[in-house]
């Protein structure tokens, strides 16, 4: 009886560890994707503002 209770406790701890690790990995992946999207949006906006200024400077306006 003690062995089955110990096995059950071990199985519960193992499953909780696996679920926590998976949730942590998913959260990290989501945060990384958000950071990448934010960086792309920043550089896109910067280029959109810089290109007209660069072309104006080249044309001497």
Swiss-Prot record:
Residues 24-41 form a propeptide. Truncated sequences of this peptide have also been found in the venom. It is possible they have been cleaved in the venom. Pfam families: Pilosulin. Expressed by the venom gland. Coiled coil: none annotated. It is found in: Secreted. Keywords: Amidation, Antimicrobial, Secreted, Signal. Residues 1-23 form the signal peptide. One of its GO terms (cellular component) is extracellular region. The keyword Zinc-finger does not apply. Its main location: secreted. The modification Glutamine amide is found at residue 59. Belongs to the formicidae venom precursor-01 superfamily. Acidic peptide with potent hemolytic activities. It also shows low antimicrobial activities against E.coli (MIC=50uM), as well as histamine-releasing activity (28.3% at 10 uM). Does not have activity against S.aureus, and S.cerevisiae. This is U-poneritoxin(01)-Om5b. It comes from Odontomachus monticola (Trap-jaw ant). The lineage of its organism: Eukaryota, Metazoa, Ecdysozoa, Arthropoda, Hexapoda.
């Amino acid at each position: 009886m003690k062995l089955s209770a110990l096995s059950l406790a071990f199985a519960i701890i193992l499953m909780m560890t696996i679920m926590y690790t998976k949730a942590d990995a998913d959260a990290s992946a989501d945060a990384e994707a958000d950071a990448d999207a934010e960086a792309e949006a920043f550089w896109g906006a910067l280029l959109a503002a810089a290109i007209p200024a660069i072309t104006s400077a080249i044309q001497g306006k």
